[in-house]
Amino acid sequence: MYRNWRDLISPKKLQVESETLTNKYGKFYAEPFERGFGTTLGNSLRRVLLSSLQGAGITSVRIKGVLHEFSSIPGVTEDVTNIILNLKGVSLKMYGTEPKTVRIIHKGDGIITAGDIITDPQVEILNPEHHIATCSKDANLEMEMVVKVGKGYVPADRNRDEKAPVGTIPIDALFSPIRKVNFTVSNARVGQMTDYDKLTLEVWTNGSVIPEDAVAFAAKILKEQLSIFINFDEEAEPSGEAEVGEGESPINENLYRSVDELELSVRSANCLKNAGIKLIGELVSRTEAEMLKTQNFGRKSLNEIKDILAEMGLTLGMKLEGFPDPEVMRRLRGERKDEE
């Protein structure tokens, strides 16, 4: 079976711009990707971040003395419609999954903000300074709001509860903890080649989830959704080990052979020599990206080496513990002298 996915260049880790990182903003870099993968993955992550992450939001409100959203409240500057608009801007974090009821009770003049919402330990207000209403000395405002966990945008009609008390007004809810996502794709260099992609991803949240976790959740969602398209069991990576006689350590003697025995082209052989690679084990320990960074080492040389290693049951990027083993080196040298 062709191992198409192993022949592609991919990043080894996600880099974070620590200087600008906060609980609400993060800037991330990943490189190198094969040409086109930066846009493919950047767009996919952006769409999932904006649409599919769970968050908390207010789904309905009941105001004492109010039967519908087109009413006004004595002593309150804002009408009910404007109060509902302001409630949509309240950012919350829930530590459970069950719906919760929160309240506002206010008498007399003053400005009501999200910090005035009475909650229990399961609900946290993330923007307590957010404006909700302005009251005069004659005001007597009592409100009950239902907070739920959900994802994406849910219109008021879907938040309607037939069992709710009379006067309950369903409202649109934006559950997503993500406020904004940007991504850009620029050129990345691997060795002498500059036609790879560098993905830069910027994420803004409401503070209920940190940007690093948001990106991780989005990637996990994509991974789960794509898994159904894989119709085979992936083969285990070659370990570079082979069983030998009883009482001996399992080794693959090819790892201790000189790279000169690979009979590479002059260009490839010189590149390995300049990189200080003497043994095949040292070669297979290098990743494709590391090899392409070697001076004058290009895709043609890479493919040549990969083909020869494949014939030996080896690949680039292998993890070899305890290599080289001095005891094995001495034993193999002794065997070769005996053969001579």
From Swiss-Prot:
Keywords for this entry?
DNA-directed RNA polymerase, Nucleotidyltransferase, Transcription, Transferase
Report the superkingdom from the record. Answer: Bacteria
Which region ranges are annotated with the description Alpha C-terminal domain (alpha-CTD)? 251-340
- Please write the reaction equations for the catalytic activity of this protein: RNA(n) + a ribonucleoside 5'-triphosphate = RNA(n+1) + diphosphate
Q: Name one GO cellular component term.
A: cytoplasm
Q: Where is this region: Alpha N-terminal domain (alpha-NTD)?
A: 1-233
Primary enzyme class:
transferase
InterPro entries cross-referenced by the UniProt entry: DNA-dir_RNA_pol_insert (IPR011262), DNA-dir_RNA_pol_RpoA/D/Rpb3 (IPR011263), DNA-dir_RpoA (IPR011773), RBP11-like (IPR036603), RNAP_asu_C (IPR011260), RNApol_insert_sf (IPR036643)
Question: Which GO-annotated molecular functions does the record name?
Answer: DNA binding; DNA-directed RNA polymerase activity; protein dimerization activity
Keyword field contains Transcription: yes
Q: Please give a single GO biological process term from the UniProt record.
A: DNA-templated transcription
Q: Which family does it belong to?
A: Belongs to the RNA polymerase alpha chain family.
The UniProt function text for this chain reads: DNA-dependent RNA polymerase catalyzes the transcription of DNA into RNA using the four ribonucleoside triphosphates as substrates.
What is its quaternary makeup? Homodimer. The RNAP catalytic core consists of 2 alpha, 1 beta, 1 beta' and 1 omega subunit. When a sigma factor is associated with the core the holoenzyme is formed, which can initiate transcription.
Identification of the protein by name = DNA-directed RNA polymerase subunit alpha
Per the UniProt entry, what species is this protein from, by scientific name?
A: Geobacter sulfurreducens (strain ATCC 51573 / DSM 12127 / PCA)
Q: What gene does the UniProt entry assign to this protein? A: rpoA
